[in-house]
């Protein structure tokens, strides 16, 4: 394909897991002629530029001459049951089960809607946090990216800035600048994309964040009064089914059909949809309290240093 004045070849790059990741590799005219003949260039699809427009039900690859970088999902909603997905959502969201369904429904039907930063914490093992992240990846495909803590600190962000979901399996962003950047990203509507060797460009930013951590006290800095986080303490799973993820994948079409028919249990009450009172949890309060205690200790140490030098 040609986008603007640049040729790209779409390739399927093998992954360690056995699957493939679709990538666009910059190509050139001479190589194209060598591989396919001099007349092939005239048949190459041509676009004026890139755009990023999320839509899961009425997806369009080309929009007014622009190539949509948002990827279509693989699943078509169809009637069926989803007992394993239901059990996973209930396990993750517990007494906030209906809010959890609302969250997933908004992701699917209203991908531009801002949503809280979902933070799943537990010091225990085998809690299903990673399984939930892999389930989201299975539903939304290439529109989900797994980031590391360092990715948030890098100036280059072109590989994740246009995604629906940015997930981190072991988050530890306990520096003030990390926390401020994460909060700003969760509410901004536009963002500067930067890639190596290319000029910065501004795009619409609609990504949501799902973070997991084994640290229940200070995975990120959250101040008192902060309303952008939804923190859930996750308990261990009662059983360990090695085929659970595959069972989840098989139920995705039925679950998506359910989401298209379900009526939301909440109405939009904030920029992140939910009334902050609904997503305030004891797990969130624990992090806020731990952060306050840490600040008090740092201030006390600072005062002691000052007094010792007087």
Model-flagged regions — what are they?
Residues 121, 267-310:
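DNA transaction DNA-binding modules
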Residues 56-167, 171, 179, 230-232, ...:
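P-loop NTPase catalytic core of nucleic-acid-dependent motor ATPases
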Residues 172-173, 183:
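Catalytic acidic motif of RecA-like/P-loop NTPases
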Residues 1-95, 217:
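N-terminal nucleic-acid engagement/recognition segments and initiation subdomains in replication
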Residues 179-201:
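Conserved catalytic/switch belt of AAA+ P-loop NTPases
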Residues 219-239:
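A short helix-turn-beta junction within AAA+ P-loop NTPase domains corresponding to the substrate/partner-engaging
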Residues 156-161, 194-212:
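AAA+/SF3 P-loop NTPase mechanochemical coupling elements
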